[in-house]
């Protein structure tokens, strides 16, 4: 009787070990790679919901766009989860204030003759491994800077205008690389003797590569502003001053890393219908240019 009981106990022990071994084997061999990862996209610092209620978001995996939709700002402020494939490269772009008709599949475009929209954007790229949760902080960045033209000492009733030309006409999408093409815009009248025009960032705000630096130097070199004054006798505009805007910006040590770029101010000193000088002020740094003789166009 004791012998039988010992045999039974031994059999139970063997069976239990077999079940445990089988269970352990299934745990060890379980493949969790098909399970997706999740990326928590969060606006850092938080976005003011009074300024933006919703933003467009584009998600890319291994260079291929996976999804594009809009998301409420309050969700981005508290953390917005996006499914991502494991062992892939994840990219997310936020965008607001850009006309839909100016958006191509892989870049944002400013049609020639238009100023830059009051757009904002953010970008984040990261490798997704085998973990299940990742964190992507996104800082909303302004995609433009403002150029202001002011005139002093002008004759009553005279008119003037400013145009800005460059070779950056938008941004790569996703990401923050520059898109190169002809940019031409005329400053709009804000008030009497004051004109303003928005120009696109001339330097990307994230992940600047060596190739970008070379192109950025060329882009800044090409950025210029031209000022015209109306000749009342002829009834046409006379070109009075060419401003090497890009060179002045470059020499000033302008901080392109700021989320919101500082505006560039051009002050004209006038005498009757002639420009005596122009003072360009950038973040407290000034350059004074003498007025040209004037060429009627």
Model-identified regions with their sequence ranges:
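Bacterial Sec-dependent N-terminal signal peptides
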Residues: 18-46, 288
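Tryptophan-paired
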Residues: 53-104, 159-251
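Structured interaction patches on ligand/partner-binding surfaces of diverse proteins
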Residues: 97-135, 233-273
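Structural motif
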Residues: 41-54, 150-157
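Eukaryotic extended interaction platforms
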Residues: 257, 264-297
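Sec-dependent bacterial lipoprotein signal peptides
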Residues: 1-24
């Amino acid at each position: 009787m004791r012998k039988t009981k010992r045999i039974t106990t031994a059999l139970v022990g063997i069976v239990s070990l077999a079940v445990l071994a089988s269970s352990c084997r299934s745990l060890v061999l379980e493949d969790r790679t098909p399970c997706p990862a999740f990326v928590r996209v969060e606006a850092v610092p938080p976005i003011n919901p009074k300024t933006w209620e919703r933003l467009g978001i584009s998600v890319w995996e291994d260079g291929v766009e996976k999804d594009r939709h809009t998301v409420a700002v309050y969700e981005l402020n508290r953390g917005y989860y996006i499914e991502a494939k494991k062992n892939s490269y994840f990219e997310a772009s936020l965008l607001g204030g850009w006309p839909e008709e100016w958006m191509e599949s892989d870049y944002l475009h400013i049609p020639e003759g238009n100023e830059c929209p009051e757009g904002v954007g953010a970008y984040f790229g990261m490798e997704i491994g085998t973990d299940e949760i990742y964190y992507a902080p996104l800082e909303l960045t302004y995609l433009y800077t403002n150029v202001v033209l002011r005139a002093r000492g002008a004759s009553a009733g005279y008119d003037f205008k400013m145009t800005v030309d460059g070779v950056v006409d938008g941004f790569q999408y996703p990401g923050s690389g520059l898109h190169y093409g002809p940019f031409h815009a005329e400053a709009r009248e804000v008030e009497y003797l004051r004109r303003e025009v928005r120009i696109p960032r001339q330097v990307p705000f994230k992940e600047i590569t060596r190739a970008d630096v070379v192109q950025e130097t060329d882009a800044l070199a090409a950025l210029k502003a031209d000022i015209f004054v109306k000749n009342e006798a002829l009834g046409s505009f006379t070109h009075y001053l060419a401003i090497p805007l890009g060179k002045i910006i470059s020499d000033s040590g302008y901080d392109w890393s700021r989320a919101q770029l500082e505006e560039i101010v051009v002050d004209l000193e006038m005498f009757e219908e002639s420009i005596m000088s122009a003072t360009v002020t950038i973040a407290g740094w000034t350059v004074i240019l003498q007025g040209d003789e004037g060429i009627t166009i």
